[in-house]
Each structure stands twice: as C-alpha cells, then as structure tokens.
Amino acid sequence: INGIRTGKCDITSKGSIERIIQEFNPSIILHCASMTNIEQCELDKNIAKEINILSTTCLIESIIDKDVKLIYISTDAVYDGVRGGFSESDKVNPLNFYGISKYEGELEVAKKENALIFRTNIFGWNIQNKKSLGEWVLDELQENRRINGFKDASFSSIYTLEFARIIDIAIRKDLSGVYNCGSADACSKYEFAVKIADCFRFDKALVLPISIDDFNFQAERGKRLDLNVNKLQGKLDYRLPTVDQSIEAFYRDYKCGLPDEIKRNISTVQEQSAIIPYGRQWIDENDIQEVISLM
C-alpha cells in the first residue's frame, strides 16, 4: 500500500504504545503482533507471555477510555482439536502455551467495548524472513525436495488477502464479539500440501503422508482444528472461500509478482525509516547509538 506512514513501537511498553497512539490518533487498531512459533512459545514461556499477553494488556490499558475500534487476531489453537468443527460457543481448551497465551489475550481484549476477535489460521506471503505453511511447502517443492504432511491433522486455513477482505467487511458492518474465521471447509495438512503442489504444477509424489504422532513435539497440538464459520458468514452475509479457493488466490498473486512486490515495498519503508532488520525485530540508528553510549 503506497503512501502509508509508519512508526515503531515497543508493544510491551504502555508508554511506547501511548506515544504511538498519540502520534497517529487511530480510529481502528488491528492487533496482530504475536509470537506464533508454537514450539518456541512452549520453550520460552516468559517471552511468549510478554509478547502475547503483556502487550495486549498494555494496549487495552492505553485505549480503554478512547473511542477506538480494536480488532484482535487470535488463533484456532484456543480449541483442543479433539473433535473438530468448532463453533464459537464451544469450550476453549488450549493444549499448548501458544494457545493459552492467545486466549489470555482474548480475555484482555474483551474488556474493550465493541472489540472484535477473530480465531483463525492463515497462510500467505510474509514480509519478514519467515515462512507461512504455504510458502514453506512451495519453496520445498520448487527445490524438488520431499516433504511430510500430517494426514491426521486438519484445519481451515485461509489466505491472508482473503482474510483482509473479510476484516474490511467486518469493519464496515461494525462487527463486534468473537468469531471463527477460516476457509468454509477443511482439509488435512497433507491434503493442503498436495493441493498446493497440484495448483502450482509440482510433483504431488513429493508430499508424503505421515501421522502427527510420529513427531516428538515439545508442545502438544490438536489434531482436528477445523472451524465452523457459519456465525461469521451469517453476520457478514458473505460466503467465505474454500481451501481450494484460498490456494487459487495464493497462486494468482504469486503469478502476479505479489511476493516480490511485498519484499520490495518493505525494503523501501526500512530505508526511509533508517530501520535495520535484526532477527524478528527492527533496530534503528537511535537504538545503535544507545548501545554504543553504554559500551
């Protein structure tokens, strides 16, 4: 998006959040900053707590009395994945600390009047040097490498640009409350990888079906995290895309050069802001000078 002004903010600092809010005076805040690596959240719970819970608490405290719409991006991992087809009224029972931390974030967000919470699972084109599941599958297949796909782990992942369209519609309708948002149907992660291989014309035989039980993860994972999205479809009067339609949109944007355009645009923002990528964070010249002054 051209012509967008940006600013940096420490999301775990209430003071930093208040300064950025004062500078931009937003009418809508979309809170999607999160530590999403499930294994890393389990191994470093303190960091996960700071990023996923404390940041949300700081944000809520900063805007609780302000006339601002808050939209929070949560996760399908708040459900236990035992039976699948989860609706918003089903019991929340996260199996890992990532899911726990995101649900704690939901509870904070619920303190804000008229807030909107989306429980979702997304894939798309990343700005930073990390990959969504869709990107990882595509990169591996492009290199003609075999990959494993869980045949017994299902989900309702939705393409990010389709999700953005849904958020836009929800804003226009002033939607509030908790909603599942995913593809209108579901598939296993093995089937998801095969669908990408098929859509991008790669060898489907490179995708091998395995059981999630064959992997010794630190964090327990739900097997059936497919979502019932009827509530959202009814409120928006909008048909959510199927998994196939999401993957087709993913492919369409790939052919149009969107991944390169995203990387190019973010590089321009970094140059204009004198910001340097460092791991999952950005540091600027002021940060560097502060470190030098202490050495």
Predicted feature descriptions by range:
Residues 2-13:
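Rossmann-fold cofactor-recognition segment
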Residues 11-51:
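NAD(P)H-binding glycine-rich loop region in Rossmannoid oxidoreductase-like domains
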Residues 43-71:
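NAD(P)-cofactor binding segment of oxidoreductase domains
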Residues 50, 54-58, 78-118, 122-125:
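Catalytic helix-loop patch of NAD(P)-dependent Rossmann-fold dehydrogenases
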Residues 107-155, 161-162, 168-169:
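NAD(P)-dependent short-chain dehydrogenase/reductase
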Residues 126-128, 153-164, 181-199, 241, ...:
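Substrate-binding strand-loop-helix patch
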Residues 166, 173-219, 223, 258-266:
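Mid/C-terminal beta-alpha module of Rossmann-like enzyme folds, strongest
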Residues 243-295:
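Amphipathic terminal alpha-helices
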